[in-house]
Amino acid sequence: RQMCIRDRDTTQRDTTRKKSFLDDIISGKNQDSLYYDVRNRTVYIYNQGDINYQNMNLKGDFMRVNMDEKIIYAHGKRDTIDGKPTVTNPTFTEGAANPYTMDTITYNIGSKKAKIKGVATQEGDGWLIGNNVKKMDDNTIHIQDGKYTTCDQTDHPHFYLAMTKAKVIPGKKVVTGPAYLVLE
């Protein structure tokens, strides 16, 4: 007696839909142009870009969205009008938190964490200003080389509490490392 064995593929084809890298839709608009680099899966947005994703909003004059890394990068624009330098900086808002104005931001859509350079945001009756800031997924922010002031001039405050490092829980408290008062 002979046995016949057929080669059969026992694995079945996966019919489940592949999960998108996003949990929701990114919507946006811009004043000038939008360029999509298909090879690198990166979108470049120029001039007054405005991106919304879930409860996050980011506005800036230049933005780069990397689909593979789930990263949005934004920076401001320096311009000269009538010989006076004009700066338009990105603004970032998440949920009901106060907006952040900054020089640059690198925001991870997946983890909801961000690295921010040159940030200013209103906290209580004053302003928190930081050179190097990390925003965590629970909206706490870690500031290195920070300032807290009630002076209206956030670019160059006349007086401030200088903080070598700080942790901010928005709407609740600010915990600092070594801090000292500066009067100019």
Model-predicted segments: where are they?
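Short, small-residue-biased leader/transition segments that mark boundaries at the very start
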Residues: 1-5
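Structural signature for solvent-exposed beta-strand/loop edge elements and short helix-capping sites
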Residues: 6-184
